[in-house]
C-alpha cells in the first residue's frame, strides 16, 4: 500500500523544521498583535462597533487589510501593507523610469536586492502617513474624544504623540522582519503572505460570533454566508487555475560529427489571473486614500473645505453606489495595468529567443512578445471582470439582503483571494520540496 504524500512531509526533517519554524513565527506574530498602542482610549474602540459614520466604515475596510489588528488599535495596526504598497509603487515605476528597468534587467539578482532595500526605505514614510491617517479616523468616532490620550502635535502632547506613531511604525517593521524570517528559513517566499493570511483567518471565529448574535435570523444569514463562502472559494480556485498554453517549437541542434539532434515542442503557460489579489489591494488603497486625506479637514473652520472633506469621506468610505462602481472600475483597470507591467518585465520574446524557442509563425524577439501580449490581454479580460465582481460582491449581497455589506461574508472578498492564493502557493511549495526528494505525487489529486 502506497503511503500518503502528507506522511512524507512530516517524515522529512528539512520540511518538518521549516513548517515548525513558520508556525512558531506566526504564533509570535499573533501574540504581538494583541498588544495595544500605549495610552489608547478603550471608549473609542468600543464605540467603533456601533459606529455608522464614514470614518467607521473606512476603518472597517482598512481593518480587513490589516488582518483585524486595526480594530483593536494594536501596535501592528498597519500590518505589512505599507511594505506591500511600497513594493507595488516601485514595480509600477519600473517601466516609467528607464534606470530602474535597466537595473532589474541587466543584473536580476542585484536588481532584486536593490528593490528590497528601497522597498524597505519607502515603507517607513508610508507607515508614518498611514499611522497619522488612522489616528485621525479614530478621532472622528466620538466627537471631542481622541483615541490616544495626550494627542496633539504641539506643546506637551508632541512627545507622547510622536512616541505612539513611532511605536506603530516599529510594529510594522517587526511584522515585515518576521515575514522575512519565514521567507528565508521557513516556507520560502511566502513570509509576508502568511503574515496577512494568519491575520485574516484569525477573524473567522469573530465573524461567526457576529453572525450568530444577529437576532433571530442568525441561522438564515449563517447558511447564506457558508454557501457564499464555498461558492466563492470554488470560483476563485477555478479562475486561479485558468491557463492558456501557447505552443513553442525548439529547433534541432547540430552536434558535430554525430549529426543533428532533432527538435521538439513544449508549451508556455499564460495564466488568466497572473497577478493574484494585488489589483484589489492597490485599488482599495487608492480609493481609501482621498478619505484618509479628507479626515484632516473634516473639522476645518472654513465651511467649503469642511463640506468638501465630508463629501469625499462619505463617498470614498464604502457602501454607496459611487464607491462600488468606482471600486469595480479600479480593480479591472489595475488588473490590466499590473498584468501589463509584469508581462513587460518578464520579456518573454527576448528570453525565448535566447533559449532558441520560437512560436510557430512568429519571428523571434519583438514580434513574439507582441503576439504573446495580445493573447495575455484577451485572457485577462474575464479574469479582470471576475476580480471586480468578487471585490464588490459583499456590497451587492448587502443591498439584496438589506444587511451590512460585511455581515453576509465570513471573510471579505480580498481576504478570500489572499487565503486561497496563499494555500495554493503553500501546496505548490510542498510539492516542489517533495519532488526534490524523489516523491512526484500530488498532495491534492
Residue ranges of each PLM-predicted region?
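N-terminal cationic and glycine-rich segments that engage phosphates or anionic surfaces
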Residues: 1-445
